[in-house]
Design a protein with these regions (language model features):
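Extracytoplasmic/periplasmic solute-binding protein
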Residues: 1, 26-74, 117
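A structural signal for short loop-to-beta-strand junctions that line the ligand-binding cleft
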Residues: 1-10, 40-41, 142-143, 147-152, ...
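Short helices/loops that flank or line small-molecule/ion binding pockets
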Residues: 9-10, 28-37, 106-120, 245, ...
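Glycine-centered hinge/linker elements that transmit conformational signals in sensory
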Residues: 29-32, 72-101
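C-terminal capping/gating helix-and-loop segments adjacent to ligand/active sites or protein-protein/ligand interfaces
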Residues: 199, 214-267
Length: 270
């Protein structure tokens, strides 16, 4: 649930990169200022990136308990609190560049890297993209929790499995042992931009990671953890795919908030 923001765009809009908004409404007000400065307020790509933005707005507007309730029936997808979140989502979509809706996350993040757009909501792998582009945290970009989600960690995990009947189980087991070792976790995650599943790294070993990754490790250790919808941690794939379809329809102007909410409720029940 991280926002990646372009320092040049924020400064052009008269915003202080070190003082991000703390509520969705305040964030939208900042987007208004970015738009007035002639820049794109927020970017998003294809449906799964749109769902990632939506889920973080749901976390912000509903809170942890009500957000988790969306997955066990305690929170109604058709309820007023979800309607409010979808209204905020609609506003954000209206601030975005629709030409990017068929692109993956990298092209949608490029305007942030180029300083031509202000905000993008994306997972921690974005830091690897900024590093590859030679961009510096604090100088070229800043990162902060989606406003209203401070103290929450929106979770997903990379997983490697040993399939039943694999032709080379020995090699697969060697890979699993390697990737789960300290050295394997450090080598994999420092390049990908993610954080280790292991929690036994020393301070010296943590020092091999970027500033962002170290902050994410601290967040994961102390914050309330919720499951990501967009990345399959909260709902079955069938439901997630149906939500992606609903957001694609909404982005294309083929549905309104009322229809989107009905589609999401039906998807969650599928």
């Amino acid at each position: 649930n991280g926002v990646w923001a372009a320092v040049p765009a924020l400064k052009a809009a008269g915003l202080d990169p070190t003082k991000p908004a703390t509520t969705i409404d305040a964030w939208i007000a900042d987007m208004e200022k970015v738009k007035a400065a002639g820049l794109t307020p927020i970017t998003m790509g294809m449906a799964w990136t749109q769902l990632e933005l939506l889920e973080t707005i749901l976390i912000a507007d509903l809170g942890v308990d009500a957000y988790n309730g969306l997955f066990d029936g305690k929170t109604d997808w058709g309820g007023a609190e979800v309607t409010k979140a979808l209204g905020h989502y609609k506003t954000c979509v209206g601030f975005s560049d629709s030409s990017l809706y068929t692109e993956d996350w990298e092209p949608a993040m490029k305007p942030i890297m180029d300083g031509k757009a202000a905000f993008n909501v994306m997972g921690d792998w974005a830091v690897a993209g900024f590093d590859a582009a030679g961009k510096k945290a604090g100088q070229d970009y800043v990162y902060f929790p989606v406003p209203g989600t401070d103290g929450v960690f929106d979770f997903l995990a990379d997983s490697f499995t040993l399939p039943d009947g694999a032709k080379h189980p020995g090699g697969a087991k060697n890979w699993l042992n390697t990737i789960s070792s300290k050295d394997g976790q450090i080598a994999f995650n420092t390049v990908k931009g993610s954080i280790p599943a292991r929690t036994d790294l020393t301070d010296e070993e943590k020092g091999k990671f970027s500033e962002y990754q170290r902050s994410a490790m601290e967040s994961f250790a102390k914050d309330k953890i919720v499951s990501s919808i967009a990345h399959g941690a909260a709902l079955p794939a069938k439901a997630t795919n149906a939500m992606n379809d609903a957001l694609t329809k909404f982005a294309q102007g083929a549905s309104d908030v009322t229809a989107l909410q009905a589609d999401l409720k039906a998807a969650a029940a599928s």
